[in-house]
């Protein structure tokens, strides 16, 4: 953070990790700089609302979690301490089905456009947000040798609100077509555009629904517990590939104790379910613990 510099006040942030699906070594997660109302770099998409997601120790988070980082340029302005609007141009990264022999992928070149409007109260600890995204995704029909572009769109209503001094409530509802790359479980596959089994050479953007709700209770000054419930629904047309994702369900409950501002210990139980379009399904139950030291 810099204050009273020749270019004004600014903030810079960088974050990385050594975990992730199928990855080894260091992974850069965020790297951005903010000056006045402008942000540039690798940052959370304007379409998301990380503050409205219940806290989990599970690194992957809920199955329908909308928590994607994009390279972007964003303008965000707040006035009267209650109203916020923002818009951003974000580097596209569509994830399109590449298994169809009748189509081929096109390079992304039209940016994603994201925007939000928000009302906040309780000194910024509570808010309601409506956000949206518009995407362009292209492919080539090999049966006619023609390029096609499909419009993707998404909308999310989210909120976080303090209910008294010890309880915080969270909630999100998201709907869209061609936004699978933004959503939890679906982001690990190529679900933004799928092959239409009834029309060779045609790809379409399937409808997706997701939602989450949760509550955090500050049991003691140093002990907090958080509950998270979530679901993700993927609604492709008739006759999708057998292993195509259909829906997922998620539950987690945790407790975190702060020994000091730098040292935390947490324990968590989580349960999840996934079902594919062919009826195959799997369930998981897991207990985990986390020891965190900050410096």
What does each model-found stretch correspond to?
Residues 15-19, 43-45, 90-92, 120, ...:
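Outer-membrane beta-barrel pore domains and translocons
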Residues 251-268:
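C-terminal closing repeat unit and adjoining cap/tail of repeat-based domains
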Residues 23-29, 51-58, 92, 96-105, ...:
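Outer-membrane beta-barrel translocator domains and adjoining extracellular loop/strand segments
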Residues 115, 120-240, 244-245:
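Detector for outer-membrane/organellar transmembrane beta-barrel domains
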Residues 25-29, 34, 67-71, 109-113, ...:
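Residues that define the transmembrane beta-barrel architecture of outer-membrane proteins
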Residues 1-95, 109-110, 114, 118-125, ...:
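Outer membrane beta-barrel
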Residues 257-259, 283-295:
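Outer-membrane beta-barrel "beta-signal"
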Residues 11-15, 30, 86-88, 129-133, ...:
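Outer-envelope exported proteins of Gram-negative bacteria
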């Amino acid at each position: 953070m810099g204050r009273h510099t020749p270019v004004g006040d600014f903030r810079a942030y960088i974050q990385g990790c050594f975990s992730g699906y199928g990855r080894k070594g260091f992974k850069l997660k965020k790297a951005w700089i903010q000056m006045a109302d402008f942000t540039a770099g690798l940052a959370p998409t304007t379409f998301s609302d990380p503050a409205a997601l219940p806290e989990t120790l599970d690194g992957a988070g809920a199955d329908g979690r909308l928590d994607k980082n994009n390279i972007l340029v964003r303008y965000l302005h707040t006035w009267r301490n209650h109203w916020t609007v923002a818009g951003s141009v974000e580097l596209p990264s569509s994830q399109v089905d590449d298994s169809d022999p009748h189509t081929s992928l096109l390079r992304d070149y039209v940016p994603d456009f994201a925007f939000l409007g928000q009302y906040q109260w309780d000194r910024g600890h509570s808010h309601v947000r409506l956000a949206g995204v518009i995407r362009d995704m292209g492919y080539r029909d090999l049966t006619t040798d023609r390029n096609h572009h499909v419009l993707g769109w998404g909308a999310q209503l989210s909120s976080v609100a303090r209910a008294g001094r010890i309880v915080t409530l969270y909630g999100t509802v998201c709907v869209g077509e061609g936004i699978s790359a933004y959503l939890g479980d679906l982001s690990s596959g190529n679900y933004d555009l799928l092959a239409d089994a009834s029309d060779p050479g045609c790809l379409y953007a399937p409808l997706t629904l997701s939602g989450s709700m949760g509550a955090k209770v500050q049991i003691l000054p140093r002990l907090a517990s958080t509950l998270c419930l979530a679901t993700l629904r993927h609604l492709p047309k008739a006759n999708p590939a057998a292993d195509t994702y259909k829906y997922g369900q998620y539950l987690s409950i945790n407790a975190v104790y702060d020994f000091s501002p730098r040292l935390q210990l947490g324990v968590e139980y989580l349960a999840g379910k996934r079902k594919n379009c062919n009826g195959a399904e799997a369930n998981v139950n897991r207990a985990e613990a986390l020891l965190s030291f900050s410096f």
